[in-house]
A protein has these predicted regions:
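Bacterial N-terminal signal peptides
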Residues: 23-33
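Positively charged n-region of N-terminal signal peptides that target proteins for export
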Residues: 11, 19-23
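Intrinsically disordered, low-complexity, compositionally biased regions/tails
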Residues: 10, 31, 38-40
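Active-site-proximal alpha-helix that buttresses catalytic centers in soluble enzyme cores
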Residues: 39-311
Length: 311
């Protein structure tokens, strides 16, 4: 079959190929015009990526996660927890890159994190939110339409695959191992329950794909002293009890990058970990792109409705 295929190609290309010069040039011009308009349509909507921010290595991992997207759209990152200063800088940067509108993708574990503050800053909410906030919310100077993503990494089934890979890569004898997935966790009890429920849903993939003794999820409630102390005691007791039963606990952090404070929390206890968060992993990039595309569609729909209302 392969030799017949090669023969047919040889016969075809051994014949003279005669194309009138006018047709050839017209084809080239059409191709260039088409590719130019495609690039233009790709780059009209900028991607403003919000991320927590941390060490140079932490920030570098986020930068790397969007490196492959920069060829398709203007990209700017606003580090900080809904910090109006970095949001304004990133917005201005996108406009300087030629963005005519902006899709804001929030690279947070929970979709609830800083959602109200961000919506207020981008003039999508009329009133400033009250309560826990690292930065005083303020309205940004907007000169282009903006749309905001609502979901977080906890809502993405793609993250389940990352958790499965982390567990399998760390496993030696799964029947004698228990998985413990630990997240940052919020202060509000009801919101924390939502975190745990979503983490447990993603952890189901490990239960299905692995043969571990148990798969467990919990949060540390890191920024709330009283609640953190109770969580630490519970987590440490679990690791200690599993060791006493002859099982090894594999700790997987459900955080964007790194191991956070867990080395300190579990100091002196026997466990296994590689300290990898969700990054680096191409599936986070896939999630960012999908959030960008859905937020971009919201922008296009909104602009279409605005045009129709003015007709």
């Amino acid at each position: 079959t392969h030799s017949l295929f090669r023969l047919s190609l040889n016969k075809r290309f051994n014949q003279p190929l005669l194309i009138p010069m006018r047709v050839f040039l017209l084809g080239i011009l059409c191709f260039l015009a088409g590719s130019g308009s495609s690039q233009s349509s790709q780059s009209e909507v900028g991607l403003l990526l919000m991320a927590h921010g941390g060490t140079e290595t932490w920030n570098g991992a986020v930068e790397e996660s969007v490196a492959s997207l920069r060829a398709d759209m203007p990209v700017s990152i606003a580090f900080g927890m809904a910090n109006p200063a970095t949001l304004q800088t990133a917005l201005d940067d996108l406009i300087s890159q030629g963005a005519k509108s902006v899709a804001v993708v929030r690279l947070f574990v929970s979709g609830e994190s800083f959602l109200k503050e961000t919506a207020y800053s981008f003039q999508l909410e009329a009133h400033a939110p009250s309560g826990h906030s690292m930065h005083e919310p303020r309205v940004l100077d907007l000169s282009v339409p903006v749309s905001l993503s609502a979901g977080g990494l906890l809502d993405a089934q793609l993250m389940a695959g990352i958790l499965v890979d982390r567990a399998i890569n760390l496993s030696i004898d799964s029947s004698k191992e228990s998985i413990l997935i630990v997240g940052h966790g919020p202060g509000d009890d009801a919101e924390n329950e939502r975190w745990v429920s979503k983490m447990d849903h993603l952890a189901e993939s490990i239960r299905e794909d692995g043969d571990f003794h148990s798969v467990n999820v919990s949060t540390l409630r890191e920024d709330w002293t009283g609640k953190r102390e109770a969580a630490e005691i519970e987590l440490q007791a679990f690791v200690r009890d599993e060791a006493a039963a002859g099982r090894t606990v594999i700790i997987i952090p459900f955080r964007l990058f790194g191991f956070g404070p867990y080395a300190e929390v579990f100091d002196g206890l026997s466990y296994r970990a590689d300290s990898l968060g969700l990054l680096p992993d191409q599936r986070v990039t896939e999630w960012i792109r999908s959030q960008y595309m859905s937020t971009k569609e919201t922008l296009i729909h909104s602009e279409t409705m605005n045009h129709q209302s003015h007709d």
